[in-house]
Regions:
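Acidic, polar low-complexity linker/tail segments
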Residues: 1-20, 31, 35, 39, ...
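Structural beta-sheet core signal
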Residues: 22, 53-55, 114-116, 145-147
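Short glycine-/polar-rich loops that comprise or flank the Walker A/P-loop
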Residues: 18, 47-51, 111-112, 139-142, ...
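Exposed acidic/Ser/Thr-rich ligand/metal-binding surfaces
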Residues: 93-142, 184, 188-193
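Von Willebrand factor type A / integrin I
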Residues: 133-193
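Short beta-strand-loop
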Residues: 55-79
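Short acidic, Gly/Ser-rich segments with clustered Asp/Glu that frequently serve as metal-coordination loops
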Residues: 21, 26-35, 60, 121-124
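Von Willebrand factor
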Residues: 74-112, 150, 154-157
């Protein structure tokens, strides 16, 4: 009860980075962008701790393990071997539904930032895509969509059915067509925490 008063030190609150989930379209319509998106995913996985990477064409494939390779070319080669539907068709809704059912409900993206990289060209059932996007937007903290067709056009309006269905659930729509646009994404991600 007697003695010197204790000195209280306030510590700053630790900033915790949210988990980052990258879901990359590797279908034929995204062939011009798939390699650069996977290189971005490799860099993200190597520089940040809680990063999960998935690819899809007609089905979802988890490639997080492949992204842990030190050499980017080896990581891309392993990812290409894992995804049998590279440069094939696109079933965005089915792939996102598989992600929600198999991974998101287990807490993988709960409170995290989910980045979907796709042009929105989908051959699947629009109702499946709508339901998957709605569930994904509820489970994640932020839902970002990279569409390489957006380029740097501020007047861009979604024109594909997949993009029109996804648009109401997206928190941020960015381009993903070149290195500068991926650098912009990297700069924006910390602010989404």
């Amino acid at each position: 009860m007697h003695g010197e008063p204790a000195r209280l030190y306030w510590r700053r609150r630790k900033v915790r980075l949210r988990p980052l989930v990258l879901i990359l379209d590797i279908s034929g319509s995204m062939a011009d962008y798939s390699r650069s998106l996977l290189q971005f995913a490799h860099s993200a996985k190597r520089s940040a701790g809680r990063v999960e990477v998935f690819c899809f064409g007609t089905r979802l494939t988890r490639v997080t393990g492949a992204m842990e390779c030190r050499r980017p070319d080896e990581a891309l080669e392993r990812a290409a071997r894992a995804a049998f539907d590279w440069d094939g068709g696109t079933r965005i809704g089915d792939s996102l539904d598989a992600f929600v059912r198999g991974w998101a409900r287990r807490g993988l993206c709960r409170g995290g930032i989910v980045v979907i990289c796709s042009d929105g060209l989908d051959r699947g059932d629009p109702a499946v895509l709508a339901a998957a996007m709605e569930r994904l937007s509820r489970l994640s903290h932020r839902l970002v969509w990279l569409n390489p067709h957006k380029r740097d056009d501020p007047a861009f309006r979604p024109s594909t059915l997949g993009m029109m269905i996804a648009a109401p659930h997206i928190d941020l729509l960015l381009s993903g067509h070149d290195l500068a646009s991926l650098e912009k994404l990297a700069a924006v991600l910390p602010g989404l925490n």
